[in-house]
């Protein structure tokens, strides 16, 4: 047994290898690939134990993420103020456990803002799942069919990174990804090509909204800073909503009307 911390002592005296950080980064990046390869090789009782351990890890991860999300939830705290500690004119106020309650309320209001506009296309044709998705066969013998490829145009954002192959259920092809939209101003009767900031609401399904699918009637958020629009208070308007009026997958472009 070693009597001293000779490894730490050597590190303090001479430092680490010059490529230590790079090697560590690459090793960490390959861990997911190694875990995937190991999971495919093992079988029998060892595989059962491995899957049970991974399942427990994922459950714990979900609980941790949920705990982080609950910090932003507005909750009434009855024990914050004791009886008789407040003057009469403050008794109607509730104690708040979370300081982020106001910001959460603002975010929720922003989410529902798309419903307040009278849109050019109030009704659109429903799209069947067979038309929206193509089934992708996977596995060694192509017997698994849990993956789907989106047949419609999509928007994924600038910092988008695909999930690992084992976890990516919905594939959005590069050729159908859109970043700009032709936006027509209804009052000026002029058309501008503006960058898309996000998909606010797809009338077909919340799933299509989360995937960023662009179909006829979808509400987009576009960057209107080039138009020089200002609010009544004199502030510059950076983004506004627009509704798609064509079928982007057929035309190869997005035509939309600005909601003013």
UniProtKB/Swiss-Prot annotation:
Residues 1-37, 60-79 are annotated as: Disordered. GO terms for biological process: maturation of 5.8S rRNA; maturation of 5.8S rRNA from tricistronic rRNA transcript (SSU-rRNA, 5.8S rRNA, LSU-rRNA); maturation of LSU-rRNA; maturation of LSU-rRNA from tricistronic rRNA transcript (SSU-rRNA, 5.8S rRNA, LSU-rRNA). Pfam families: Ribosomal_S8e (PF01201). Transmembrane segments: none annotated. InterPro entries: NSA2_fam (IPR039411), Ribosomal_Se8/biogenesis_NSA2 (IPR022309). A motif (Nuclear localization signal) lies at residues 11-18. GO terms for cellular component: nucleolus; preribosome, large subunit precursor. Keywords: Nucleus, Ribonucleoprotein, Ribosome biogenesis, rRNA processing. Belongs to the eukaryotic ribosomal protein eS8 family. Ribosome biogenesis protein NSA2 subfamily. Involved in the biogenesis of the 60S ribosomal subunit. May play a part in the quality control of pre-60S particles. Component of the pre-66S ribosomal particle. Interacts with NOP7 and RRP1. Interacts with RSA4 (via WD repeats). This is Ribosome biogenesis protein NSA2. It comes from Cryptococcus neoformans var. neoformans serotype D (strain JEC21 / ATCC MYA-565) (Filobasidiella neoformans). The gene is NSA2.
